[in-house]
Amino acid sequence: MAIPSRLRRTTDQREALLRDLVTDLIINDRITTTEAKAKSVQRVADKMVTLAKKGTLAARRQAAETVRLEDAGEGKDALQKLFSVIAPRYNDRTGGYTRIIKTVPRRGDAAPMAIIEFI
C-alpha cells in the first residue's frame, strides 16, 4: 500500500485542507486542484460516498466528522447532499466514485494541475 502524501503540511493543516476540499467536491461535483491534492482528496471522497451508501445514523455521524456544514443550495447542506443526492447515484457501483483528469500546469509555478470529479 502506498504511503499517502503529506502535502508539506502538519497533520492538523492537512486534515483541514482535505475536509475543505472534500466538502467543496460534494457541493460542486468537480474541483480543480494540484495532482497531489487530488489524489489525497480522492481517497477521502470515496470513503465518504461508501459511508453515505450505508445510510445508517452511525455512518452519517462518521461522515459528519469529515464533511463541513456548508450550504449546498436547494436548502441542503453538504452532508445532506452527500446522503440524499450523491450516494443514490452509486447504489450499483462498489467503488471508484471519482476520477482525476490531468490538465495543463499552473501558470506561475508550473505545478501539475488536475480536475477531480464524481463520475
From Swiss-Prot:
PROSITE patterns: RIBOSOMAL_L17 (PS01167). One of its GO terms (cellular component) is cytosolic large ribosomal subunit. It holds the Pfam family Ribosomal_L17. InterPro entries: Ribosomal_bL17 (IPR000456), Ribosomal_bL17_CS (IPR047859), Ribosomal_bL17_sf (IPR036373). Keywords: Ribonucleoprotein, Ribosomal protein. GO terms for biological process: translation. GO terms for molecular function: structural constituent of ribosome. The keyword Cytoplasm does not apply. Belongs to the bacterial ribosomal protein bL17 family. Part of the 50S ribosomal subunit. Contacts protein L32. This is Large ribosomal subunit protein bL17. It comes from Acholeplasma laidlawii (strain PG-8A).
